[in-house]
Every structure is written in structure tokens, then in C-alpha cells.
Amino acid sequence: MSQQQDKQPSENKLWGGRFTGATDPLMDLYNASLPYDKVMYDADLTGTKVYTQGLNKLGLITTEELNLIHQGLEQIRQEWHDNKFIIKAGDEDIHTANERRLGEIIGKNISGKVHTGRSRNDQVATDMRIFVRESLLNLSKILHQFITAILERAHKEIDVLMPGYTHLQKAQPIRWAHWLSSYATYFTEDYKRLQEIITRVNQSPLGSGALAGHPYGIDREFLAKGLGFDGVIGNSLTAVSDRDFVVESLFWSTLFMNHISRFSEDLIIYSSGEFGFIKLADAYSTGSSLMPQKKNPDSLELLRGKSGRVFGQLSGFLMSIKSIPSTYNKDMQEDKEPLFDALTTVEHSILIATGVISTLSIDKQNMEKALTMDMLATDLADYLVRKGVPFRETHHISGECVRKAEEEKLSGIDQLSFEQFQQIDSRFEKDVMETFDFEASVERRDALGGTAKSAVLKQLENLKSILS
């Protein structure tokens, strides 16, 4: 037997009694999660505080012991908060570290009762749900602020017209506020989904033990209420092994980042010299180390780039859990790094996006100068529809007008003479020239969801009512 195998396992290991040989130091490092799960210190201490209240109700901890435990837990909380908590060898995870420190403060004869009937399986599941719930509530708050900033901008700049694009080609005139409302709609749907996920996250696994349930009949509903959960997970096997809430949180983060990526891509294009529709504030731009004239939209490019990072966290975690058997397996430890990274990335992304949209300036003149008369070709077709001509026929006629203007090298279809319109189709009348007005074009799109001023204002009010 090697010298390493002769060593006794660390006294700090919660599971050390079964083993006679020490673990490989690399295995200790490979197995440890404290470097990243220490962010859950507050959730872990809160969970233990309420759990010991449940043990006190059962008579397994005296009230005097409970008070000492709670005092010790609050001291540990303060140490973590002040960055004074000392991590020691054998602190495998946040649960081990906190329990070890509690023993140092109040003595192991009392701290040793804290884990009665509890497993790290239900403990970590509880910590995760508390941490994720609080993280998602924070995301909900700042996402609300982001959407509100978009809506306020849309109200303020409701009268600004710009080209709308399909295939990145000029399509039809729209209101700048309509574009803003479009993304506000995406983000409001994200906001609504987030509320649904928070409801599903907020279920308590505490009191499920390792897998089979609690041996002392602890009041799980009491524990759930004390921790702010809406209810309990009704099956102990599921309670310790369910990570659907992690997957949902990652999927939500992925979908949101997809939306923020598209939002950023549009703004990157609009900020380019070729478009010149918007200008980012200096606070959200950077320069070039070589070219003094450059003002780069790095904030938006990072928002776009970090979406791929979050997508990867989701796909990676799904691969980690796709084939694991029921109840708890160590694979589940791989839930934390991708989730914590994704939640932090999304939080920072929302804050950056809020700053960008709140501080950018628009160039109304450039937006309106980019409008071209060929964008009113559909309006020309609609003109004939109102004269009773079938749309498929009017579409063809309007296309002929566009082709004629190109052949004549005219700047737009509005430059065709009335006689030329009549040569193409005799049903054109002199009022056809009234078609070529961008403001009139957008105002004709007044159906629900359209780009007319009344329609956009209704969209903004609807979104505002959802948020309120």
C-alpha cells in the first residue's frame, strides 16, 4: 500500500468516516466546487437557519442551541460579506466550509446537530433554488427598467421616420418608434417568460434527505414558508435531482441574449458611417490604437458576442445531464459554473443595453434622407387596389412603374409623369401623385400593430400596461 493511501482522510470531509485512505490531491481539486459555489453563501446560511428551526420544532435541537447556531450563522454571513472568511484545506464546497466554520465558533457538539436528517443533496438543491430565484428577481427588475427606457425613447421620438428593412434592403417607411416598439415587444415577452420561470423555480426541495425522504418527519411546508418558497416539491427523488429550473434559466438567458444580439446588430448597422442613423455616447464606445478617427460600437459588439457564450452554457449543460440516472449524481455539480456565468452575463448585458439605448443620439435628418421613393411601390399598388383592381394585378403594374423609372434613369417612381403612368395603366388618375408621401404612407398603416402614429402609441401603451 502506498504512503498516500495510508493517510487518513481529512477530518473536515463530511463523508470521511467511511474511508481509510486519503484522496489524491488532484481529486480533491477536481471534486471541489467552493471556488464558484461560494457565491451561494447567503442562500446556504439562510437555508441552514430555517432548517434548524424545523429541527427545533421536532425537539432535536434545544432553543438555547438554536440561538447559538443562529448567532454563529450570522457571524459567518458577516465574514463572507466583509471578505474575511478564511477558506481552509478540506473546504470542499460552500456547505462544508460553512459547517466547519460554525463548529469553530460554537463547538462541534452543537454544530454537529445542524445536519441532522439533511443531505447535501437537498441542501444544494435548496441553495440553488434560493440563489436562482433571487438572481431572476433581480434580472426581472433591471429588465423592466430596460424596457421602460425603450418605451420612453419611443414616446419622445414618435414622429421620426426611417426606412424599414427586409433582407437588409430598404422595404417600406416606418417610424423609429415602431422599430423601438418591436424590440420592446420581444423584451416584454422575455419579461413575461421570466415571471413564469420564477414561479417554477420557487418550490422547495428541503427536507427530502439524500433521496428517500426525511427520517424524523420534519415539516417541509414550514421550511418552505420560512424560505419564501411557494410550495414543496412533492417527490423526494425528484426534489434532489431536478435541474429543470437550471435548464429553463439557461434557456431563458439564451433566448434573451438572442434578442439582445439582434437588437445590437441593428444598432451597429445604424451607427455605421454608411447609415449614420444613430451615434453612441462616448461612455459606450471605444477607439482604435492606430486610427485616431475611429469610434467603435464595442458595447454593442460585446452584447452580440456574449450571446454565443450564453448559448454555449445551455448546450454544454444539456450534454452534461442528458444520460444521468435518477436522483442525485455528481454530474449535477456541473450546473453551477454555466448557470452562474450566464446569469452574470445577462445581468451585465441588460445594464449595458439600458445605458446604450438611454444615451445614444439619433440623426433625424439622415434617417429621413435615407427614405427613397421606390419604398412606396407597395403604396402605388395599394392605390390601384382602392380603385378596384385586384392586388396581384396591381403588384405587377407597380413593378412595371419601377422598371420604367429605372429605364429612364429617374431618381424615383415619383418622377414619372402622369402621362407615363397612364401609358402603363389607364386606371391611374391624377391623384396618383398624392401617393408619394412618406408620412401619408406610414399613416395608412393604422391597423393594430402597424406603423401609423396611432397604432404605435397603442403598442406602447399596451406594453406599458403589461409591465405595470
From Swiss-Prot:
HAMAP family: Arg_succ_lyase (MF_00006)
Record-stated family: Belongs to the lyase 1 family. Argininosuccinate lyase subfamily.
Binding site for 2-(N(omega)-L-arginino)succinate: S33, N121, T166, N296, Y328, Q333, K336
Record keywords: Amino-acid biosynthesis, Arginine biosynthesis, Lyase
Catalysed reactions, semicolon-separated: 2-(N(omega)-L-arginino)succinate = fumarate + L-arginine
Pathway participation: Amino-acid biosynthesis; L-arginine biosynthesis; L-arginine from L-ornithine and carbamoyl phosphate: step 3/3
Assembly and interaction partners: Homotetramer.
NCBIfam families assigned to the protein according to its UniProt record, in alphabetical order: argH
Protein species of origin: Candida albicans (Yeast)
Site (Increases basicity of active site His): E301
GO BP annotations listed: arginine biosynthetic process via ornithine; L-arginine biosynthetic process
EC number: 4.3.2.1
UniProt KW Lyase keyword: yes
GO cellular component: cytosol
Identification of the protein by name: Argininosuccinate lyase
Gene3D superfamilies noted in UniProt: Fumarase/aspartase (C-terminal domain) (1.10.40.30), Fumarase/aspartase (Central domain) (1.20.200.10), Fumarase/aspartase (N-terminal domain) (1.10.275.10)
InterPro entries linked: Arg_succ_lyase_C (IPR029419), Argininosuccinate_lyase (IPR009049), Fumarase/histidase_N (IPR024083), Fumarate_lyase_CS (IPR020557), Fumarate_lyase_fam (IPR000362), Fumarate_lyase_N (IPR022761), L-Aspartase-like (IPR008948)
Active site: residue positions: H167, S288
